């Protein structure tokens, strides 16, 4: 590729998925340029590596580019995209560039509605500890590397595979992982679960006949899909029918202890430096990948015990002063009812006897509409709920399915400990009266609520 392509331009380079691919391209020796509307830590990191980044969208930015990479968030009438098409500069989706990087390596693609970022991070950490030195591209910052991407020296490339727009069908990996299948991003699938399932089947069939698919047997939707697959399958889970399963699972503070049983290996123990039974499943997926590649049990144990976590995935910041109250802050990206329930359940186990205050920003009106009853059910597990306005992500408001509607539905079901705030500034003004010493404050959502968590962990007031 380097003989034909010298400069790669990324439109919307500040997005975590785009930035990871851009970083790998920089490290491969390509000239990387890009544009975005605002600066953020990810963009500053890329600039420090040599990327040429502009903070507006203008046709002049792409004049010297050999290819333009876009994410699904970029409008078709973007001036850079329009100029590139008029100039016959190839315009390709982010996943197509990832596929090109994967084509040159042994690709490991990790998909699923929930848990794929953590699973990709765990697999990357284990393979690195095992001496395989993989390249990885992740949808979140792997804390021990302080980055969401890294160019390794080996043939292995581990990547998070995105089903939200079905773009994972661009990939042709040697090994695929599916953590679970749940209804989300249903606008991509015409609101029909059968279309979603068929797309996951096609994703697995992107494997060569000698490839392997690793799937969670505990997930009912995956169980239903298995008879439709015609590739080698390895299963993991808590179920006795799993090829690789966890037993003797014990929650201790912010870590999980369990044993791993595999059909062809002696049982071994694991300490995972992450809380929650859902993270045991994520770890099992990563362990299965590692065992397929002959990584030693000792390397698996060491990597999981020392795992530094992922940005905004149950990131815990103890002893923070918020509103002059001493609290524990937990920052999490979860924005689907299943993720809310898993995170709140994990917090209950990690912080027994403490009051859980959930600050939640719903993400997209369409998701709130499609999963309205599920959100109402999941949000009731908090002791105190603070709902921010829905983060629209470019969607037009739907009044019947906004935060006020969620709040009203919860109160009709008897959950009175909740309130709606219209802005993060208003929330900051209310913290002194809302919070108590020793509270656990969970900040959750996929929108700009992450900035609130960053502000709270960086400054006491």
UniProtKB/Swiss-Prot annotation:
Identify the pathway: Cell wall biogenesis; peptidoglycan biosynthesis
Q: Which reaction does this enzyme catalyse, per its entry?
A: UDP-N-acetyl-alpha-D-muramate + L-alanine + ATP = UDP-N-acetyl-alpha-D-muramoyl-L-alanine + ADP + phosphate + H(+)
- Organism per entry: Hydrogenovibrio crunogenus (strain DSM 25203 / XCL-2)
What biological function has been recorded for the protein in this entry? Cell wall formation.
Question: Localized where?
Answer: Cytoplasm
Member of which family?
Belongs to the MurCDEF family.
Q: List the Gene3D superfamilies.
A: Mur ligase, C-terminal domain, Mur-like, catalytic domain, NAD(P)-binding Rossmann-like Domain
Q: What is the lineage of its organism?
A: Bacteria, Pseudomonadati, Pseudomonadota, Gammaproteobacteria, Thiotrichales
- Entry EC number(s): 6.3.2.8
Report the GO terms under cellular component. Answer: cytoplasm
Q: Which Pfam families match?
A: Mur_ligase, Mur_ligase_C, Mur_ligase_M
Please verify whether the record's keywords include ATP-binding. Answer: yes
Residues the record lists as binding ATP: 112-118
Which GO molecular-function terms appear in the entry? ATP binding; UDP-N-acetylmuramate-L-alanine ligase activity
Q: What is this protein called?
A: UDP-N-acetylmuramate--L-alanine ligase
Q: Which domain of life is it from?
A: Bacteria
Against PANTHER family, the record matches this protein to: UDP-N-ACETYLMURAMATE--L-ALANINE LIGASE, UDP-N-ACETYLMURAMATE--L-ALANINE LIGASE-RELATED
């Amino acid at each position: 590729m380097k003989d034909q392509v010298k400069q790669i331009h990324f439109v919307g380079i500040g997005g975590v998925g785009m930035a990871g691919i851009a970083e790998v391209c920089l490290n491969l020796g390509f000239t990387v340029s890009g544009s975005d509307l605002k600066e953020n830590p990810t963009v500053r990191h890329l600039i420090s590596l040599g990327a040429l980044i502009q903070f507006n969208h203008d046709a002049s930015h792409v004049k010297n580019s050999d290819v333009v990479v876009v994410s699904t968030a970029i409008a078709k009438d973007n001036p850079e995209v329009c100029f590139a098409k008029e100039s016959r500069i190839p315009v390709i989706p982010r996943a197509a560039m990832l596929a090109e990087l994967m084509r040159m390596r042994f690709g490991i693609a990790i998909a699923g509605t929930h848990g794929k970022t953590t699973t990709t991070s765990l697999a990357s950490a284990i393979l690195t500890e095992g001496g395989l030195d993989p390249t990885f591209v992740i949808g979140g910052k792997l804390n021990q590397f302080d980055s969401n991407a890294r160019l390794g020296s080996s043939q292995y490339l581990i990547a998070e595979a995105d089903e939200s727009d079905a773009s994972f069908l661009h990939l042709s990996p040697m090994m695929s992982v599916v953590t679970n299948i749940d209804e989300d991003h249903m606008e991509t699938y015409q609101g029909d679960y059968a279309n979603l399932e068929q797309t996951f089947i096609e994703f697995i069939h992107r494997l060569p006949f000698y490839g392997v698919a690793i799937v969670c047997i505990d997930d009912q939707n995956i169980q239903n899909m298995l008879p439709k697959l015609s590739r080698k399958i390895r299963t993991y889970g808590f179920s006795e029918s799993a090829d690789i399963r966890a037993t003797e699972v014990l929650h201790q503070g912010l870590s999980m202890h369990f044993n791993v049983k595999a059909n062809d290996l002696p049982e071994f123990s694991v300490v995972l430096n992450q809380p929650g039974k859902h993270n045991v499943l994520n770890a099992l997926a990563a362990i299965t990948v590692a065992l397929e590649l002959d990584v030693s049990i000792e390397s698996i144990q060491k990597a999981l015990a020392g795992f530094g976590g992922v940005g905004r995935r149950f990131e815990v910041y103890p002893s923070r002063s918020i509103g002059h109250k001493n609290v524990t802050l937990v920052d999490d990206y979860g924005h689907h009812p299943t993720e809310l329930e898993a995170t709140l359940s994990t917090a209950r186990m990690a912080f027994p006897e403490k009051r859980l205050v959930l600050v939640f920003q719903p993400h997209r009106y369409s998701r709130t509409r499609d999963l309205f009853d599920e959100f109402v059910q999941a949000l009731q597990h908090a002791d105190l709920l603070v709902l921010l306005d829905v983060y629209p992500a470019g969607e037009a408001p739907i009044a019947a399915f906004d935060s006020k509607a969620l709040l009203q539905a919860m109160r009709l079901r008897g959950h009175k400990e909740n309130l709606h705030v219209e802005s993060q500034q208003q929330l900051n003004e209310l913290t002194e009266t809302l919070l108590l010493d020793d509270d656990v404050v969970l900040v959750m959502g996929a929108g700009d609520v992450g900035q609130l968590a960053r502000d709270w962990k960086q400054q006491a007031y």
